[in-house]
From Swiss-Prot:
Pathway where this protein functions: Cofactor biosynthesis; coenzyme A biosynthesis; CoA from (R)-pantothenate: step 1/5
Family that this chain belongs to: Belongs to the prokaryotic pantothenate kinase family.
Protein name as catalogued: Pantothenate kinase
Underlying gene: coaA
GO molecular function, one term: ATP binding
Record's catalysed reaction(s): (R)-pantothenate + ATP = (R)-4'-phosphopantothenate + ADP + H(+)
PANTHER family noted in UniProt: URIDINE KINASE (PTHR10285)
GO biological process, one term: coenzyme A biosynthetic process
Bilayer-crossing regions: none
Length: 316
């Protein structure tokens, strides 16, 4: 079926890997193998080929969208007779735990910052906007961490709203996976970047998720382009367990780690623990809150084994 025929049946254009890779055109590779190695996650094999075939075409597409947005801003400034404020273009990246959102975000940050039109690219994760553990404990939400109710949504929305309003310096809280908590007094200042990449579980939620409050303002109201990183559930579970096992031998061995006790588990005990955590928390959150937002994304990247993207769907 041709792309034109597909477009009559779905709001998305669908590309297999080779079709998408061809859209790279003549965009040069601007990352070295060493730089790519530093960008990949603990559980991923990010290759030069993956960057060339998947992320370079995506960076080219985003550059077109961002350039168009800048032209639109210039038209508005000309109409109003004003000198425009620096308003960042916001890209959100959503998807399940362990799917590789952070790697996607880091690769895009590296690639987009090398385009001459927009050098300043900031990356913020929504983990920092989780309520502190003390608040979650008081509300009985420690086992709901990552669910919508565990976030300080008012602060997150104010953060993106201030950026889109041209506020010169906006602060974002920072999360530590070592202590499994928001770092007290650890705020990061974001000063009018050209692009902000916002990565997190909950960035695609819309008013449909809050039927009791039809006037609810959400992060998605301020996002210019949204990406959903997708994969089959059985792969997500496998990746989550494998990541847990690697943390057990790495980060969990740090005495300061919140999960230090997990480092003492046998491999069988660790697999059982990770499986329980996946089924009781992360899978539940995926089914209830994350997966239902997938079709709201501007672009859906679907992964197969080894975190290789096999299909891309782009909203018309």
């Amino acid at each position: 079926m041709s792309i034109k025929e597909q477009s009559l049946m779905t709001p998305y254009l669908q590309f297999d890997r080779s079709q998408w890779a061809a859209l790279r055109d003549s965009v040069p590779m601007t990352l070295t193998e060493d730089e790519i190695a530093q960008l990949k996650g603990i559980n991923e094999d990010l290759s030069l080929e993956e960057v060339a075939e998947i992320y370079l075409p995506l960076s080219r597409l985003l550059n077109f969208y961002i350039s168009s947005n800048l032209r639109r801003q210039a038209v508005l400034e000309q109409f109003l007779g004003t000198n425009g404020q620096r308003i960042p273009y916001i890209i959100s990246i959503a998807g399940s735990v362990a799917v590789g959102k952070s790697t996607t975000a880091r690769v895009l940050q590296a690639l987009l910052s090398r385009w001459p039109e927009h050098r300043r690219v900031e990356l913020i994760t929504t983990d920092g906007f989780l309520h502190p553990n003390q608040v979650l404990k008081e509300r009985g939400l420690m086992k709901k961490k990552g669910f919508p109710e565990s976030y300080d949504m008012h602060r997150l929305v104010k953060f993106v709203s201030d950026l889109k309003s041209g506020v010169p310096n906006v602060t974002a809280p920072v999360y530590s996976h070592l202590i499994y908590d928001v770092i007290p007094e650890g705020d990061k200042t974001v000063a009018q970047p050209d692009i902000l990449i916002l990565e997190g579980l909950n960035v695609l939620q819309s008013g449909m998720d809050y039927p009791h409050d039809p006037h609810h303002v959400l992060v998605s109201d301020f996002v210019d382009f949204s990406i959903y990183v997708d994969a089959p559930e059985e792969l997500l579970q496998t990746w989550y367990i494998n990541r847990f096992l690697k943390f057990r031998e790495g980060a969990f061995t740090d005495p300061d780690s919140y999960f230090h006790n997990y480092a003492k588990l046998s491999k069988e005990e660790a697999v059982n623990t990770a499986t329980s955590l996946w089924k009781e928390i992360n899978w539940l959150n995926l089914k209830q809150n994350i997966l239902p937002t997938r079709e709201r994304a501007s672009l859906i990247m679907t992964k197969s084994a080894n975190h290789a993207v096999e299909q891309v769907r782009l909203r018309k």
